[in-house]
Amino acid sequence: MRVVVWLVEGTWPACVDAVRTHAPRATEVVLLHVSEPGVPGLAHGAFAGLLGRGHAERDPGNRLEDLGARSAARLLDAAAERLGRACTRQERTGRTEREVVAAAEGADLLVVARDGDRARLGPHSLGRAGRFVVDHAPCPVLLIWPEATPAVTTIPPPPPHPPDPPHHPHHPHHPHS
């Protein structure tokens, strides 16, 4: 059984714990972290626009890329240590939700933490990326609460029922037709 675990800062410990609890016999565990290319790319562009391309050693985009890579490596190392068993560490760069779906191809299970409003039950507990991943994953998804699950009383009230359509006297199901 191949399990892919999407790791995000702040919620990754719960995802790792979910693998230990719900997939203890997994034959392969892939710890996945995805970095968005946006911030370093913006810094590269701003630097090149202001000072030209001749001073690469001073480009703040390079420093941001290095910081991001080191942070991702530390997160993956901490997750592997918490898992306490053999695993593969995978760092990808791109549109987060699409990279997660691509990494889950061929997996038997994808572990995902809720990334939206985690204070109440309901559809808003998934953010944009989480919703995309849940809707497009090519395998079963284990969707977890990274903290204590909110009480059932936090479910939003149902929308009002639409009024019944008017009955037409000549309709075939009308009792006087």
Named regions from a protein language model:
Residues 22, 100-103, 133:
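Structural alpha-helical scaffold elements that stabilize or flank donor/cofactor-binding regions
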Residues 1-58, 136, 146, 163-177:
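Small/aliphatic-rich secondary-structure junction motif
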Residues 17, 77, 131:
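Active-site phosphate/pyrophosphate- and oxyanion-stabilizing loops and adjacent acidic/basic residues
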Residues 109-136, 150-152:
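Glycine-rich, Arg-bearing micro-motifs that act as flexible, cationic patches
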Residues 113-114, 141-146:
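Short beta-strand elements of ligand-binding domains
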Residues 30-32, 88-92, 142-144:
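General small-molecule cofactor/ligand-binding pocket signal
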Residues 10-11, 80-110, 148-177:
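Structural beta-alpha unit
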Residues 53-74, 119:
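A short acidic, glycine-rich active-site loop
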